[in-house]
Amino acid sequence: MTEHVEGTLSSGQYWQGWTGDVPVKGVVVLVHGVHEHGGRYAYVASRLVAAGYPVYAVDHPGHGRSPGTRGNIGSMAATVAGVDELARRAGSRHPGAPAFVYGHSLGGLIALQYITGTPIELRGAILSAPAVDVSAANPVQRAASGLLSRLTPNLGVLKLDPATISRDLDVVRDYRTDPLNYLGKLRARTGAEILNTVVAMQPRLEALKLPLLVFHGTADRLVPPAATEFVAEHVGSADLTVKLYDGYYHEAHNEPDRDGVLDDIVAWLDAHS
């Protein structure tokens, strides 16, 4: 049986968690992607909880049930701080349990920023389609996005198509009708924070020695699979597992064969807990 818990961080951000009645092998801090929220990972959480891994997720600033302009994360520093506070709270709820961070898309970038900084003691990290698109972080785009971020931070600059998240039409429909998702264009401030973080994080990858599982759908049109290849080539971890799912879209955990993906995640967690 899965128990749902929830609360707010010191920033006012909403967090939630899923726990179970099976022995705890480890605790997972889940970091969601842009324009969505932690509640979209209820099924992922149910699978991990059943395997002995309680899951905790925080809604980023401007996302889900957290305060802020919809779709505007404000600053990467504040977003990472929210992940850190939740990770510490989750750890205190399960003292002694190995801790893992699991980030998807923008959440993968946030997770990388966190784990290459000063995180809590971690046993490993899982990155799903991490938003590390180096080709987009060129000087011209960064300069333009920085100017827009300062002058018009809430301006919509890029439309993201929900049809590209999964081949499962029910998943796409649910995404479009979920009132907690933001369906507008990517905000200028959020875009600038993403590009700046991609650049700032790159030189820190070599020092990252944490065990990693990185996976990506080969048909992802939102974050190119080259992002996962870049991470795999530049991290310093000797314990690195990369999985590419042929023909899968952006959310491999929400594809028709999502249980196969989740089986792989559980197996990796079991091998590292």
What residues fall within each predicted segment?
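Conserved alpha/beta-hydrolase "acid-adjacent" motif
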Residues: 221-227
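Catalytic nucleophile-loop/oxyanion-hole region of alpha/beta-hydrolase
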Residues: 35-38, 64-94, 261
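Active-site glycine-rich loops that stabilize anionic/oxyanionic intermediates
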Residues: 28, 33-36
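Short beta-strand/loop motif that positions the catalytic acidic residue
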Residues: 208, 214-216, 220
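Conserved alpha/beta-hydrolase
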Residues: 45-68
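Alpha/beta-hydrolase fold nucleophile elbow
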Residues: 94-104
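Alpha/beta-hydrolase-fold enzymes
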Residues: 104-186
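Catalytic active-site module of serine/aspartate enzymes centered on a nucleophile-bearing elbow/loop
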Residues: 241-273
